[in-house]
UniProtKB/Swiss-Prot annotation:
HAMAP family: MatK. The gene is matK. Usually encoded in the trnK tRNA gene intron. Probably assists in splicing its own and other chloroplast group II introns. It comes from Quercus suber (Cork oak). Belongs to the intron maturase 2 family. MatK subfamily. It holds the Pfam family Intron_maturas2. GO terms for cellular component: chloroplast. This is Maturase K.
Amino acid sequence: MEEFQGYLELDRFRQHDFLYPFIFREYSYALAHGHGLNRYMLLENIGYDNKSSLLIVKRLITTMYQQNYLIISANDSKKNPFFGYNKNLHSKILSEGFAIIVEIPFYLRLISSLEGAEIVRFYNLRSIHSIFPFLEEKFPHLNYSADILIPYPAHLEILVQTLRYRVKDASYLHLLRFFLHEYSNCNSLIITNKSISIFSKSNPRFFLFLYNSYLCEYESIFLFLRNQSSHLRLTSSGVLFERLCLYRKIEHFAEVFANDFPVIPCFLKDPFMHYVRYQGKSILASKDTPLLMNKWKSYLVNLWQCHFDVWSHAASIRINQLSKHSLDFLSYFSSVRRNPAVVRNQMLENSFLLNNAPNKLDTIVPIIPLIGSLAKAKFCNAVGHPISKLTRADLSDFEIINRFLHICRNLSHYYSGSSKKKNMYRIKYILRLSCVKTLARKHKSTARAFLKRVDSEFFQEFFTEEGGFISLIFPRASFALRRLYSGRVWYLDIIFINGLSNHE
């Protein structure tokens, strides 16, 4: 996105926020695709004039407005080379252009807000593991949690209306709305979940932007309501992008809230309420009674149905007691348990024992879903018995070991925060034995015979545990350091969930 600053007239752009002209600029699509449109054109139509990419974009937009577009494309595909292109190629070209263009005002506002407030950017906070220290600190003191599956709208108009709060260019929004309706390939405004799934896979960047805009709008209202119902007022909720009539709407919310709820009973105020979200799943935890959690459950369902016109039901929000149920969040099973400890106290001639049982957050590797992911990837069968990987039998021994080692290290890296290492050891065993069986099958031998034939140092790096690397790097490492490494470790360089771990 930094490359756009060399092309934009920033002062004039910030004054008007016009996005429609960027649709017809060549560099927008060149930056979106990396190598320009020609890469896609040459793959689909060899010999076509590769200098007419901008003209093609204009024709694509023009034909979208024609009511008989599908008829023309079917009848004239042999006469006009333009209509010979794949329709999926059309949507991919335009959607990638739309995605990078609509991000421009948000990126510029983010840069200006960071510069004006002189906020230091902590890139480590982008790590998924940065959430778990927060959970370890807060959740042992809480009683109830609500597992929330945030519904995404099946109505295309909702996604466009969400952008209207932040994008002022009506022409761009009109073209965007028309493109989304044309993509659904139906006259109805309602599309099925299957169509949304196809759109999210074929246009991931554009879909994530629209979905994140919807989440941002939802959470801005939710945080306002949570702030009004809490003793501890939120002083900051991060960087909030500019919205049209934002402060006017906040004043309206405050006025309605004051009129409808002039006095909030004390039992509806909760000073210990915490909210965390990743993608479309969130957790709302509280120290108060289930009555308050059910109240918030009703608030959220009404918010989705009345404000966003998104159908939701109470079953999408499950309220559980933290001490009796586990949280399935970020590919970990997390639960709060009591950690009994006995402390001996000596006072002059008297001594006595103090029994202390503080709560502790346990994070466990979900062994059954993870074995299911390994079975789907053909590393083992459904019950967890390792099998050979057929697709890698044609590689060299070094490449086979290196690929298995890479997968094993990635999983160990992500699940380094597990309270119990036993489940992770089983996953490593499956991967190691699968590697041995793959090599044995390549050399037309059995796993036992292959291990006897190869050198003992052949698998030394593969079978070395992570804890052993500290002894190799620091031979005189203290016992405290080794004990610390054997416990939970959260890394601040993990920005996405491993594919095998993402079983949600």
